[in-house]
Amino acid sequence: MIYPVIDPAGTGSNLRSLIVSSGNSIADVGRMLGIADMSTMYKWLRGDALPGIDNMLSLSIILNVSINDILVTK
């Protein structure tokens, strides 16, 4: 069986869209997550890194979506 893999760039782009659609700014979401260095958020949005599971759960709550709605697979 072949399992899907997470597409970091697609997930980052999707995350950006979800943040904008929620009416929050990227900085607002970063503050809600307690992220001191905003470069972390931008790494996620560019697809250079993925949020850890704790931040992914928090993002799903902040954005009122499921984790599966944030992730893009290929």
Predicted regions and their residues:
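DNA major-groove recognition helix of helix-turn-helix
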Residues: 44-45, 74
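Short C-terminal boundary/hinge segments that cap the last helix of small helical domains
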Residues: 64-74
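Short, basic-rich loop-to-helix N-cap that marks the start of a DNA-contacting helix
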Residues: 47-58
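Residues within the helices of the helix-turn-helix
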Residues: 16, 27, 57
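Short alpha-helical DNA-recognition segment
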Residues: 23-43
